[in-house]
């Protein structure tokens, strides 16, 4: 089955869609007038998501969107693109009868910024089967997300599907004016998800780490002060010890010379 002519985009979370994103979304409609367009919001997300348990445990929009894009494509098929991707020309040529098309942001490195798939594609089925709730397996939240439902998961699964089409970086990530002339889209990397819930969560984590660092430094400061005080006390006690009379000291030095 081929990739159906549907463009999916997701906007979830408490904040309204920023103005630049509205223009980038419109660019996809402009270059694909005959295609169906779906902007998924909180109000029309799947009522019975396959990974409902995982979604319920995720609070950050970026985390939920990573899972939802897989599920939407598995159910409906089509092309998913992030809202900060600006379309430059039609996708018709790059799809060309394929049933799955991945996008590379670096040679051999797959991104989930844009994905095209036929409904029910086995790669997406496997990806959804491997999605786990975001428990604390990783210290770095970003790396945890990439592995659980993001680019690293796709990158690993693609190895078992050698026939899928992978677009080279210049198609969606042009780095020169010459590459842009032939690119399908350009990624503005607005990282808008990180301006809301994710940013607040990151700030809370940073505050906790800062508080731990402050506590550790305070403990070290107290230990240093106690050590300094103890050394001063020992030096004070040493100075209080009576010194032997001068004659006794001279006799001792003379004895040491004779011993040599």
Indicate where each model-derived feature is located.
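Glycosyltransferase-associated regions of secretory-pathway enzymes
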Residues: 1-65, 81-260
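Small-residue hinge/turn detector
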Residues: 66-78
């Amino acid at each position: 089955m081929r990739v159906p002519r549907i463009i999916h985009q997701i906007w979830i979370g408490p904040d309204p869609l920023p103005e630049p994103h509205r223009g980038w979304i419109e660019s996809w409609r402009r270059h694909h007038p005959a295609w169906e367009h779906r902007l998924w919001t909180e109000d029309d997300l799947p009522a019975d998501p396959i990974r409902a348990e995982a979604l319920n445990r995720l609070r950050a929009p970026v985390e939920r969107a990573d899972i939802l894009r897989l599920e939407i494509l598995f159910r409906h098929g089509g092309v998913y693109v992030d809202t900060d991707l600006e379309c430059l020309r039609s996708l018709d040529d790059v799809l060309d009868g394929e049933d799955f098309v991945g996008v590379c942001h670096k040679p051999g490195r797959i991104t989930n910024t844009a994905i095209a798939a036929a409904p029910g594609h086995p790669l997406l089925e496997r990806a959804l089967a491997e999605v786990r709730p975001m428990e604390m397996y990783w210290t770095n939240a970003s790396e945890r997300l990439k592995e659980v439902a993001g680019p690293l998961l796709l990158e690993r699964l693609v190895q078992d599907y050698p026939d899928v089409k992978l677009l080279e970086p210049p198609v969606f990530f042009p780095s020169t004016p010459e590459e842009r002339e032939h690119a399908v889209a350009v990624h503005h990397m607005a990282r808008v998800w990180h301006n809301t819930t994710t940013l607040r969560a990151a700030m809370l984590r940073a505050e906790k780490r800062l508080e731990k660092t402050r506590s550790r430094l305070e403990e070290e400061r107290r230990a240093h002060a106690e050590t300094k005080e103890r050394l001063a006390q020992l030096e004070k006690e040493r100075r209080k010890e009576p010194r032997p009379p001068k004659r006794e000291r001279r006799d001792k030095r003379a004895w040491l010379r004779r011993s040599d």
